[in-house]
């Protein structure tokens, strides 16, 4: 299963970007053994529209244009479900075993996602009740992708 990340906003060069790349590199090196592959990180600029609703709609349109068809969509959203690392790994394994070819995980901009994006989501994922800066949300997501592979491979990185 090909996994892509769609992110509104661009990472600045620095420690956060290095950490995201490190986790994606670790993921890519060991994910093939469990039928997962990292396809791409697609970054789009934040909308400059005047209202939050307009910005979310514009960013949502960019997401829909980028979605391969057919694909599954996980949307990172504060209204989503907070799950354990094992439950997240099981969700990805379920999609893979179901024969899903493309999975896109979407990180929204400062305003979040539009209602249309949330409605299209196959799963709404929350990183908990706290608000996270965009760079840290990317780190959390990429670390969990790597952790998913370590869980599937029974690697000691994830302590059971």
From Swiss-Prot:
InterPro entries reported in the protein's UniProt record: Alpha/beta_knot_MTases, RlmH-like, tRNA_m1G_MTases_N
SUPFAM superfamilies: alpha/beta knot
Coiled coil: none
Gene Ontology molecular function, alphabetical: rRNA (pseudouridine-N3-)-methyltransferase activity
Major subcellular location class: cytoplasm
Catalytic activity: pseudouridine(1915) in 23S rRNA + S-adenosyl-L-methionine = N(3)-methylpseudouridine(1915) in 23S rRNA + S-adenosyl-L-homocysteine + H(+)
Residues that coordinate or bind S-adenosyl-L-methionine: 108, 127-132
One of the Pfam families matching this protein, by short name: SPOUT_MTase
Compartments, record wording: Cytoplasm
Entry keyword set: Cytoplasm, Methyltransferase, rRNA processing, S-adenosyl-L-methionine, Transferase
GO annotation, cellular component aspect: cytoplasm
Keyword Methyltransferase among UniProt keywords: yes
Keyword Methyltransferase: yes
E.C. no: 2.1.1.177
Task of the protein: Specifically methylates the pseudouridine at position 1915 (m3Psi1915) in 23S rRNA.
Family membership noted in the UniProt record: Belongs to the RNA methyltransferase RlmH family.
PANTHER family, alphabetized: METHYLTRANSFERASE, RIBOSOMAL RNA LARGE SUBUNIT METHYLTRANSFERASE H
Subunit structure: Homodimer.
Protein name according to UniProt: Ribosomal RNA large subunit methyltransferase H
Native species: Bartonella bacilliformis (strain ATCC 35685 / KC583 / Herrer 020/F12,63)
Lineage of the organism: Bacteria, Pseudomonadati, Pseudomonadota, Alphaproteobacteria, Hyphomicrobiales
């Amino acid at each position: 299963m090909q996994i892509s990340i769609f992110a509104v906003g661009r990472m600045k060069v620095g420690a956060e970007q290095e950490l995201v790349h490190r986790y994606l590199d670790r993921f890519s090196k060991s994910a093939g053994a469990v039928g997962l592959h990292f396809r791409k990180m697609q970054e789009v600029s934040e909308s400059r529209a005047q209202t939050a609703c307009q910005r979310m709609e514009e960013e949502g349109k960019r997401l829909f244009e980028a979605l391969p068809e057919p694909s599954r969509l996980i949307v990172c959203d504060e209204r989503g479900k907070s799950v354990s690392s094992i439950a997240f790994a099981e969700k990805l394994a379920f999609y893979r075993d179901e024969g899903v070819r493309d999975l896109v995980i979407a990180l929204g901009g400062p305003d979040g996602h539009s209602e249309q994006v949330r409605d299209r989501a196959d799963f709404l994922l929350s990183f908990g009740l706290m608000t996270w800066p965009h760079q840290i949300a990317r780190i959390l997501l990429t670390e969990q992708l790597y952790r998913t592979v370590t869980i599937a491979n029974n690697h000691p990185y994830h302590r059971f």
